[in-house]
């Protein structure tokens, strides 16, 4: 019984990975093969689903980001303020998924960075985007 549940979980994970890979070309085209958070080019990029994830991968809720950004999102307590001051501009992106991730990162940084608190005080997000941003945290 346990083995069949583990097998089912693995199959579900593999199916999701394949579905994300299917978005790869469209993500690369949209991102112009650059990290959608920092604009960094010439580095390995990977798909990042902005939580909470939907039942099926959705390109509008998925970003193409660098390994450095992925690591920062996985371990937000290690964010270094000076390295992320670009968030002051990124949060104004026209893409909701970028706004959500930037907003969440700013809130993590605001616990110890004055500049992040100042940016948050100035940011205005569309109601729907703000609800998405507040629905989860890093």
Language-model features, listed with the residues they occupy:
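N-terminal alpha-helical interaction blocks
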Residues: 2-6
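C-terminal, charged low-complexity interaction regions
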Residues: 129-138
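Polybasic, low-complexity binding patches
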Residues: 7, 73-112
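OB-fold/S1-family RNA-binding modules
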Residues: 120-126
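An accessory alpha-helical subdomain
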Residues: 112-119
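Histidine-centered nuclease catalytic patch
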Residues: 8-9, 13-20, 28, 37-64
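Zinc-coordinating Cys/His ligand positions in small cysteine/histidine-rich zinc-finger domains
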Residues: 65-69
